[in-house]
């Protein structure tokens, strides 16, 4: 993973959250799909699954920075483990 890919994944995460109604969450695979689509449009054929390690690392940093929070089935998660959803940090 490069710093550029990490920043791109963080930006995509925050953009997807900004496009959603307050209180809603996104799945990390949505971020990976958005990144893969953008790269494929640029001429590279990228499978979204290949983007998941980059997305996970970006999410970890966003959690550390306090910009997003994680949950699963409505219960908060302190750190990424297993399946999870992402929401804005400013929301309950």
Spans of model-derived segments:
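Positively charged, polyanion-binding regions of nucleic-acid-associated proteins
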Residues: 4-29, 53
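Short, conserved active-site loops that position catalytic residues or coordinate cofactors/metal ions
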Residues: 27-38
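A general secondary-structure junction signal
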Residues: 30, 72-74
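Short, positively charged loop/turn segments that connect secondary-structure elements
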Residues: 36-56
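Alpha-helical DNA-recognition elements
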Residues: 61
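A short, conserved structural fragment
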Residues: 64-71
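Short, cationic-aromatic polyanion-contact patches
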Residues: 74-92
